[in-house]
């Protein structure tokens, strides 16, 4: 009987090892956010503290993950996504690229939803591999009765482990919907269905526990790629919100504080009051980069005589693009090329 039991155990271990060898390898980079949030009450979905739970604990809470991929976790940070900075982004990019250059088949980043689109867009521009990077979050903390994080995480790992995800760039997955990092944005402060790409739509959805893509892999038209492996810092770039009666004083203050470039969230197609336009024209003539985006949330901002148009990038993504562009050039026309809006 003992011999039979031992044989069964050995057989089970061999089967498990064989399965592990055939599964894809996925590394989860934990940064905190609501998905790792904790509240005093299970009914509290707003008064919680983000970035309280370790990434290893998040993985352990979803035992089905082991059927999808060989998973390990790295705690990059554990904070609210509003605290994610250039130092964290650069470190995460270097880690992801080093892993993807080896035997890691996909990367998952757990992240707070408030700035998910910025991190995802950054990773999309700096990924040096065709292997997928998937950014995932949650709208309810891990302690909530109906927390969305566990299913979102399982979907994210499944997506990162899928061969069909190769060549699609960085993606964002929440609420069963797969979005391209280049276009996806958070559109509601409370809705579970918060991420949208108004003009471009989604890449796919989850059905029956598997990703279903609407299109074959395709590259965003004109999307640049940046190698950040040797960078230790990123240029300081700030955003100003346009409004009636706005003056140029904030622009002057930002330049004095050390900003190397400015993105203006203008009204409509990047419109700003005359006093601000005159200031931007003056800066443009001096070679200082100002990018005009739109506060509308969607649409295209065309090339301007007095400034760089952001194309189809919203202000927060235009800031990421300008930061990375400035690591390669100071020429305004070359910078405009990264936005696809050369004059």
List the predicted regions and their residue ranges.
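ATP/NTP phosphate-donor binding region
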Residues: 21-97, 249, 278
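C-terminal non-catalytic interaction/assembly regions of soluble proteins
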Residues: 269-343
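Short acidic, glycine-rich surface-loop motifs adjacent to enzyme active sites
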Residues: 101-116, 257-269
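Gram-negative bacterial Sec-dependent N-terminal signal peptides
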Residues: 1-20
């Amino acid at each position: 009987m003992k011999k039979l039991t031992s044989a069964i155990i050995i057989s089970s271990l061999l089967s498990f090892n064989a399965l592990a060898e055939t599964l894809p390898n996925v590394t989860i980079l934990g940064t905190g956010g609501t998905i790792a949030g904790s509240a005093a009450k299970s009914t509290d979905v707003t008064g919680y503290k983000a970035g309280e739970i370790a990434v290893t604990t998040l993985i352990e809470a979803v035992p089905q993950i082991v059927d999808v991929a060989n998973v390990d976790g790295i705690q990059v940070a554990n904070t609210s996504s509003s605290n994610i900075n250039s130092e964290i982004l650069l470190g995460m990019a270097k880690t992801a690229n080093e892993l993807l250059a080896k035997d890691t088949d996909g990367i998952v980043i757990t992240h707070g939803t408030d700035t998910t689109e910025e991190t995802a867009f950054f990773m999309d521009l700096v990924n040096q591999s065709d292997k997928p990077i998937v950014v995932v979050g949650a709208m309810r903390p891990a302690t909530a009765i109906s927390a969305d994080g566990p299913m979102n995480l399982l979907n994210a790992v499944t997506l990162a482990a899928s061969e069909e995800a190769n060549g699609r760039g960085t993606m964002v997955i929440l609420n069963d919907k797969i979005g391209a990092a280049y276009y996806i944005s958070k559109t509601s402060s409370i809705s579970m269905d918060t991420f949208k790409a108004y003009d471009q739509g989604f890449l796919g959805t989850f059905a029956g526990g598997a990703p279903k893509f609407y299109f074959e892999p395709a590259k965003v038209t004109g999307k640049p790629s940046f190698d950040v492996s040797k960078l230790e810092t990123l240029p300081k770039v700030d955003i100003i919100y346009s409004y009636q009666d706005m003056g140029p004083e904030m622009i002057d203050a930002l330049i004095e504080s050390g900003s190397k470039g400015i993105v203006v969230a203008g009204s409509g197609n990047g419109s700003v009051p005359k006093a601000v336009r005159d200031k931007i024209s003056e800066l443009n003539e001096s070679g200082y980069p100002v990018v005009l985006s739109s506060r509308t949330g969607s649409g295209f901002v065309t090339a301007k005589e007095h400034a760089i148009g952001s194309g189809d990038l919203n202000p927060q993504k235009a800031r990421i693009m300008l930061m990375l562009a400035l690591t390669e050039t100071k020429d305004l026309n070359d910078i405009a090329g990264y936005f696809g809006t050369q004059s």
